[in-house]
Amino acid sequence: MVNAITSGDILSAEQIKRHSKVYAGPGAGKTYFLVENVKNIIMTNETVAKSRARKVLCITYTNAAVDEIRRRLEKYVDYVEAYTIHGFIIEHIIKPFQEELINIIKSDFDISVSKKGMISSQIEGLGILHGIDKEEIYNFIKSTNPGQFDSDAFNYSKKIMGEVEVDNDLFLKSKIAGEELIHKIKASSKIKEDHVIPLKQYVWSVVRKLTHNEILYFGYRILENNPTALYALRVKFPFIFVDEFQDTNPLQTLLVKLIGQKSTQIMVVGDIAQSIYSFQGAKPSDLND
């Protein structure tokens, strides 16, 4: 059973034992609801109050919103963590489970990546190949893919290098709903375009960065593939609040639902009439599901 409440409510002791959906329009105090309910859980729920190893997780969709939540909950810093969805995945899934990430890159894309060095996220606002000499890329590709990447392919790839951070459109489309998205990714990952796969090998092996779409994809795949990773998150975060849920794209929704299948209670807060990230494939209707 799922609670369906308004942003004026404080969740009762019984309600926090179930997943909750909070409907609130613009200016209805969604952040206030989130902050006050986090405080209530910290002060009244023994699972969190008596163990600083177990925390309330807040996920929202802008760095400014993260800063605001952290500011309002500053006194409770030992009991709560706040991130954007990408920040959460990097910190709690990608970084701790690097070996699993490398194995999934191999199994899903048939690309071998060395275990030397941390694979993390690109710097916000910069292309993933920002500041890297194209000849360095060419020499790497020639050495690792002899005979598979000729000069014509390289000349073509140079035209798209400025777009490598979004070349996931070739096999990481996020405009497809639910499980269909995962099947689409897995199916099209078998494509071996000479100008894409070697570049991806360079980015993942040498630059060691993931694009925003890749963070979502690999975060989900690690949890799907590694019960230990999933269990660790459920133990650490018995309560998760997701703000602006109407802006959640299908892969983000799948990830949150996966965590919430056992133990962890999910509270989603949103307004189905207002989606500022619809270009990412966000489905406001997920708030009703």
Question: What is each of the regions a protein language model found here?
Answer:
Residues 2-5, 194-241, 249-255:
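Conserved helicase/translocase P-loop NTPase motor core
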Residues 103-204:
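Coupling/switch/interface segments within P-loop NTPase motor domains and analogous charged loops
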Residues 255-289:
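Conserved RecA-like helicase ATPase core segment
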Residues 41, 89, 245-256, 275-277:
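Catalytic P-loop NTPase motifs of RecA-like helicase/translocase cores
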Residues 60, 76-96, 191-220:
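Inter-Walker segment of RecA-like/P-loop motor cores
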Residues 1-102, 231:
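P-loop NTPase Walker
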